[in-house]
Amino acid sequence: VEIRLEEGGIKRIVVADNGCGIPKEDLPLALKRHATSKIRTLTDLESVASFGFRGEALASIDSVADVTITSRTAEAEEAWAISRDGIVPAAGQKGTRIEVKDLFYLTPARRKFLKSAATETAHILAQVERMALATPSVRFRVFTNARASLHLPAQPTAERVFAVMPAEFKDACRPLEADAPGLHLEGWVGLPTAARSRADKQFFFVNGRFIRDRVLQHAVKTAY
């Protein structure tokens, strides 16, 4: 996954992958609300393995920005791009590229609530770190104003954890693993001697999804 930002993503965001791509006939559905390729039967809801499955993200972004999706499947001879102007042939490798320009230009009142470019960039990098921890088998690269900001190659889980966490964490942590009925827990915890005053490097994941939970945070804090 490669992400390119301009002015903290306010001016332009490009997210590209080398996945399976979206067939031409399905591209219009990508921007429709409540349309998704992640769910095909009701039973799929019982074991969701993807980050998104409600079909709302792209439609929501398309309603407040200029969005272009370019995609190509392995079977297709060429890529296709969809935007407000319709669907046209395009150059592109296998996978999907989503370009978002002029965020909130359709809703100026909401645009003024955006923070500075530096702050918005920091928020995006933090989100990428969370996704990277959840999917260590995926390579992530982030470029900010054409300069490399983050590069995490596909790697084993432990190496990904140490790449995202502060440098001192590797020598000041212990692996954690436990089992209970219907539950398997694993992770890494820092030693009390390396405790931080802030909880900005606490990450909790349930079935591969990042969550914020005050009960878990309180349990960890109480243990220390």
What are these regions (language model features)?
Residues 1-224:
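N-terminal phosphate-binding caps/lids of nucleotide- and nucleic-acid-binding domains
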